């Protein structure tokens, strides 16, 4: 008699998902068209999928639908499932890091990071000692353990994004949604944040969907890269077998290799076709 465990449902599944803004009016705009994909629940680790596409093609709309945010949800058509269950709104299993700095200005770094734990302590079954331990642990991991009592206006842009990442990961979400989190940073800080993300992702075993406008960043961070069409957005190309970053290795050590540069050119060639409105194989 077989004792094999039944297969896990996909960690994320989109079934024919579409989104139309202002339907039935002169301002009607079709943002997403027939989005279909499954992301498997891999044992011991999650995938990081980088999402690129022209401006206004619905990348952020797709993330916001998956997050269940009220401003976007529900989709106009189709269904979104997380681990086999329909998404009906926000949940602790999904965390999000935005492009704009999203810390509460009146709270310290420490208070910002513990905000979600305090808000959901009953759901998470956490007592004060564990909340404090988790917060201090994650602030140390993102290199802010010496800045606990500072306020957001006292931090650099990179430090503010470290706060946002710690606040997201401290809740231990199964899915992390990142909407151009490093685009406002200068190049050295951006590279350092890429390195930090690789190290933290190796620890948390979460599935990450990362929207970025940088092909280099997408190829460096992604297990897979998805390219979106012009609006209405849909996935028109997927790239796999990309050079894999390793914890502790500076991004430039990978990004200057021939294999990495070749992968960037492959993605760039298709991206140029999309922007020109040419068909994609």
Q: What is each model feature region?
A:
Residues 67-70:
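Helix-to-loop junction immediately C-terminal to a conserved catalytic motif
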Residues 75-89:
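Conserved ABC transporter NBD signature motif
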Residues 85, 118, 126-147, 199:
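Conserved ABC ATPase "signature" region
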Residues 107-116:
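Short coil-to-helix segment of the ABC ATPase nucleotide-binding domain corresponding to the Q-loop/switch region
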Residues 151-155, 159:
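Conserved ABC ATPase signature
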Residues 165:
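Hydrophobic anchor residue at the start of the ABC signature
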Residues 170-174:
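A short, proline-enriched helix->beta-strand linker immediately N-terminal to the Walker B motif
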Residues 176-179:
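Catalytic Walker B motif of ABC-type/P-loop ATPase nucleotide-binding domains
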């Amino acid at each position: 008699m077989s004792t094999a465990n039944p297969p896990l449902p996909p960690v994320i599944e989109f079934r024919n998902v579409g989104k139309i803004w202002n339907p039935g009016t002169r301002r009607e705009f079709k943002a997403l068209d027939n989005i279909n994909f499954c992301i498997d629940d891999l044992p011991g680790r999650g995938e990081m999928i980088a999402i690129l596409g022209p401006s206004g093609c619905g990348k952020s709309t797709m993330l916001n639908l998956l997050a269940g945010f009220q401003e976007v949800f529900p989709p106009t058509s189709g269904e979104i499932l997380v681990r086999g269950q329909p998404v009906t709104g926000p949940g602790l299993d999904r965390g999000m890091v935005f492009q704009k700095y999203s810390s509460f200005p009146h709270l310290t770094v420490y208070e910002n990071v513990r905000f979600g734990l305090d808000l959901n302590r009953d759901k998470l079954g956490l007592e004060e000692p564990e909340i404090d331990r988790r917060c201090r642990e994650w602030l140390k991991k993102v290199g802010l353990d010496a800045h606990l009592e500072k306020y957001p206006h006292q931090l650099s842009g990179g430090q503010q994004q470290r706060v946002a990442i710690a606040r997201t990961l401290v809740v231990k979400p199964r899915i992390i949604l990142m909407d151009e989190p490093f685009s406002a940073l200068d190049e050295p800080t951006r590279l350092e944040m890429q390195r930090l993300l690789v190290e933290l992702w190796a620890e948390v075993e979460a599935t990450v969907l990362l929207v970025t406008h940088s092909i280099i960043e997408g190829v460096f961070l992604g297990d897979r890269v998805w390219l979106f069409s012009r609006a209405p957005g849909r996935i028109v190309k997927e790239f796999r077998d990309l050079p894999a970053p390793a914890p502790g290795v500076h991004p430039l050590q990978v990004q200057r290799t021939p294999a990495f540069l070749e992968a960037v050119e492959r993605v760039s060639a298709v991206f140029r076709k999309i922007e020109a409105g040419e068909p994609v194989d």
